[in-house]
């Protein structure tokens, strides 16, 4: 039973209790989900690099997200003044940057970060905003190689998945 300062929802990863101070409001929604405004972040596993950005408006909607800096040290985004005002940013340290992660069914080797649609969250004001990036030098996706056998992640320094038999040019991180 949920307490007065929390809500309880059934999600694709099970029943979750969400305290009201963990709700993040997205005034514009997200790309493709403009009508969904209230979300929370759910941890899948302790220490895992991935989270679920869970909609509270639609409990069936949860997006896999990750901190891009866990995989890329040189990822840069541009945030204009209107977006900074909407996020109520007073200091850059108030913002967390996340990117959506796609894992095609049955093809974990094609796990990719979406670098062109970062999600910014002002953790103090609990406001979120997706800020599309238009930098042509930025690859739209950044492919990861997930190795369940030893729990490691290998980063592919290329913008497309490997072809069959192709040397992956992997760098361990």
Curated annotation (Swiss-Prot):
Q: Does the keyword Cytoplasm apply?
A: yes
InterPro entries from the UniProt entry: Flagellar_assembly_factor_FliW (IPR003775), Flagellar_assmbl_FliW_dom_sf (IPR024046)
Chain spans, region Disordered:
152-173
Report the main location listed first in the record.
cytoplasm
Q: Which residues cross the membrane?
A: none
Query: Domain of life here?
Result: Bacteria
Give the matching Pfam families: FliW (PF02623)
- Gene Ontology annotations of biological process type: bacterial-type flagellum assembly; regulation of translation
Q: Which UniProt keywords apply?
A: Bacterial flagellum biogenesis, Chaperone, Cytoplasm, Translation regulation
One annotated Gene Ontology cellular component of this protein: cytoplasm
Intracellular or extracellular location(s)? Cytoplasm
- Tell me which family the UniProt entry assigns to this protein: Belongs to the FliW family.
Known role: Acts as an anti-CsrA protein, binds CsrA and prevents it from repressing translation of its target genes, one of which is flagellin. Binds to flagellin and participates in the assembly of the flagellum.
Subunit description: Interacts with translational regulator CsrA and flagellin(s).
Protein name per UniProt: Flagellar assembly factor FliW
The protein's organism comes out as Nitratidesulfovibrio vulgaris (strain ATCC 29579 / DSM 644 / CCUG 34227 / NCIMB 8303 / VKM B-1760 / Hildenborough)
Ranked from the top, the taxonomy reads: Bacteria, Pseudomonadati, Thermodesulfobacteriota, Desulfovibrionia, Desulfovibrionales
């Amino acid at each position: 039973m949920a307490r007065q300062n929390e809500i309880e929802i059934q999600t694709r990863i099970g029943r979750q209790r969400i305290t009201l101070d963990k709700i993040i409001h997205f005034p514009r929604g997200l790309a493709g989900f403009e009508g969904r405004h209230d979300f929370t972040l759910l941890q899948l596993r302790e220490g895992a690099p991935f989270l679920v950005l869970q909609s509270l408006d639609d409990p069936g909607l949860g997006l896999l997200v990750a901190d891009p800096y866990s995989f890329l040290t040189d990822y840069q985004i541009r945030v204009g003044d209107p977006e900074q005002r909407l996020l109520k940013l007073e200091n850059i340290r108030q913002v967390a940057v996340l990117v959506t992660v796609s894992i095609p069914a049955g093809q974990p080797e094609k796990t990719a970060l979406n670098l062109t649609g970062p999600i910014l969250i002002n953790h103090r004001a609990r406001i979120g905003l997706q800020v599309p990036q238009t930098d042509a030098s930025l690859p739209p996706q950044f492919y990861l190689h997930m190795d369940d056998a030893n729990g490691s992640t290998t980063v592919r320094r290329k913008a497309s998945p490997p072809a069959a038999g192709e040397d992956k040019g992997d760098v361990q991180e």
